[in-house]
UniProtKB/Swiss-Prot annotation:
The keyword DNA-binding does not apply. The record marks 112 as: Transition state stabilizer. This is 2-hydroxy-6-oxo-6-phenylhexa-2,4-dienoate hydrolase. Pfam families: Abhydrolase_1 (PF00561). Homodimer. It comes from Pseudomonas putida (Arthrobacter siderocapsulatus). Catalyzes an unusual C-C bond hydrolysis of 2-hydroxy-6-oxo-6-phenylhexa-2,4-dienoic acid (HOPDA) to produce benzoic acid and 2-hydroxy-2,4-pentadienoic acid (HPD). Pathway: Xenobiotic degradation; biphenyl degradation; 2-hydroxy-2,4-pentadienoate and benzoate from biphenyl: step 4/4. The gene is bphD. The active site is at residue 265. GO terms for biological process: acylglycerol catabolic process; biphenyl catabolic process. Keywords: Aromatic hydrocarbons catabolism, Hydrolase.
Amino acid sequence: MTALTESSTSKFLNIKEKGLSDFKIHYNEAGNGETVIMLHGGGPGAGGWSNYYRNIGPFVEAGYRVILKDSPGFNKSDAVVMDEQRGLVNARAVKGLMDALGIDRAHLVGNSMGGATALNFAIEYPDRIGKLILMGPGGLGPSMFAPMPLEGIKLLFKLYAEPSYENLKQMIQVFLYDQSLITEELLQGRWEAIQRQPEHLKNFLISAQKAPLSTWDVTARLGEIKAKTFITWGRDDRFVPLDHGLKLLWNIDDARLHVFSKCGHWAQWEHADEFNRLAIDFLRQA
């Protein structure tokens, strides 16, 4: 297979959904077969490619059409201030993208904020989802054991409010378990993404005031999710508490949970090979 690059897979389209009128969405696309849409997290400078460049190739080789979507207000997608909880608005953006591309049904893979987006989508559009793969998703309210917000979320908001290379480095150090994976290339790439779109950072903070994290909680509606669900978590996640994985397991009818040891908040990146194998096996099962 020809090596996939960000530029060779980069595309744009416009969607029209509530809160996103004539809105430009950026995405990366490759492969053929059943559609898998991968949804990134909510840290400053995040985007589809930076979140999933270690996953897109193996999924394409496994026979899937893969779409890495930049959520509204992130990376190359249009800027936006949201009056409603972000997971719900992001779910509408996923629906809008699917409508524009003529996709009736898709599997969703979501990390952190992307997981919250996937949960909202599964609740609001149950006939449009295939299977659901979640990695440390947000949107699940308080923890049974840990005071909220966790350390990583505090550093995330600090970086939004005071963008600097040092604050970025502090957040990434909490993000990953294996500190040897933190390279200047990783930090510089994320820092450049932050600097390219300062408007995204300001709008995120304004949106967080209008619809704070407490409004994201969809726990009461998890029982509505009928999609087969594969939940993964990093044992050492310092952004979203591990007991939220149990909350999902208890409330979603057809769910299973895998916990990665020596893993932070970015399972699909930090343990890419194992994650890819487990996730693809899950999608292939009847």
